[in-house]
Amino acid sequence: MQPPGDDAAPRCPFAGAHAPDAPHVPEAAGDDVQAGWHRAQLDFSQSMSYGDYLSLDPILDAQHPRSPDHNEMLFIIQHQTSELWMKLALYELRAALASIRDDALPPAFKMLARVSRVLEQLVQAWNVLATMTPSEYSAMRPYLGASSGFQSYQYRELEFILGNKNAQMLRPHAHRPAIHAHLEASLQAPSLYDEVIRLLARRGFPIAPERLDADWTQPTRHDRTVETAWLAVYREPNAHWELYEMAEELVDLEDAFRQWRFRHVTTVERIIGFKQGTGSTSGAPYLRKMLDVVLFPELWHVRTTL
């Protein structure tokens, strides 16, 4: 509000640090050369630029097609960007695990929601790869050797954190000791869902001792006492609001994860049909079998019980 009798026009708070009473003088045509385009900084010889901050040079220099085929660049970038999204998903899941252990659930909700959005990005990425035809893929496939997404150690850690444990999946990484050790630690640690079940016990729900002291290297299996606890939560959500919200965040997460897996299968079938995968898996049949994996079984079964 202007003081009484003050006829000066109000200044925009974002107008910069010019003197308030200075008259506006149009800039000369050549002023942009000296002051920067629309006052933007143009000289980064002494300061950090966008490319410096993001380390773009090594990232954009990390694509090395092995074939003369035009479409290999798409194949490489598709998988590299997926690995970057998985890096973010793992970063958020580790933070969510720590928050759940500390009974700090609101931050965990935000992190889990973000992971679900990351998975949506990964689902959409298959649409780009699906522009590659079977003929185009066949031209570059011999250059892939035995490399396969099956060997992605970030994907394997993601599966382990979400509870789909399988010690045999360590073997493809035996030639890289540091990665093997990292994955083995993830295999032996409680999964995200294991920590949520511990949370249920801390909130007073009677969870079977053998479930709370389970062999963490084994995949998640349905437990009656866990389903009974979730049933109580869903029947009185207002009395257990944080647990109710946690349950729904987990369902959102698994829903998105299933969609990612399904889109993977359909893209593979579209491009290579039912040929053997480059990593010697059965290809599409192997991926279809993975669609049957249920990460949080009680949360799905309780919907029938309600």
UniProtKB/Swiss-Prot annotation:
GO MF, one term, reads: heme binding
Which stretches does the entry tag as region Disordered?
A: 1-29
In which pathway does this enzyme or protein participate?
Amino-acid degradation; L-tryptophan degradation via kynurenine pathway; L-kynurenine from L-tryptophan: step 1/2
Cofactor(s) it depends on: heme
Q: Look up the record and give one Gene Ontology term from the biological process aspect.
A: L-tryptophan catabolic process to kynurenine
Cite the entry's keywords alphabetically: Dioxygenase, Heme, Iron, Metal-binding, Oxidoreductase, Tryptophan catabolism
Q: List residues binding substrate.
A: 75-79, 137, 141, 278
Which reaction is catalysed here?
A: L-tryptophan + O2 = N-formyl-L-kynurenine
Q: Does the keyword Heme apply?
A: yes
InterPro entries cross-referenced by the UniProt entry: Trp/Indoleamine_2_3_dOase-like (IPR037217), Trp_2-3-dOase_bac (IPR017485), Trp_2_3_dOase (IPR004981)
The record's cofactor note says: Binds 1 heme group per subunit.
Q: Which residues bind heme?
A: 264
EC nos: 1.13.11.11
Under HAMAP family, the record lists: T23O (MF_01972)
Q: Which function does this protein serve?
A: Heme-dependent dioxygenase that catalyzes the oxidative cleavage of the L-tryptophan (L-Trp) pyrrole ring and converts L-tryptophan to N-formyl-L-kynurenine. Catalyzes the oxidative cleavage of the indole moiety.
Please describe the quaternary structure of this protein.
Answer: Homotetramer.
Regarding protein family, the annotation reads: Belongs to the tryptophan 2,3-dioxygenase family.
UniProt-recorded name of the protein: Tryptophan 2,3-dioxygenase
Organism for this UniProt entry = Burkholderia mallei (strain ATCC 23344)
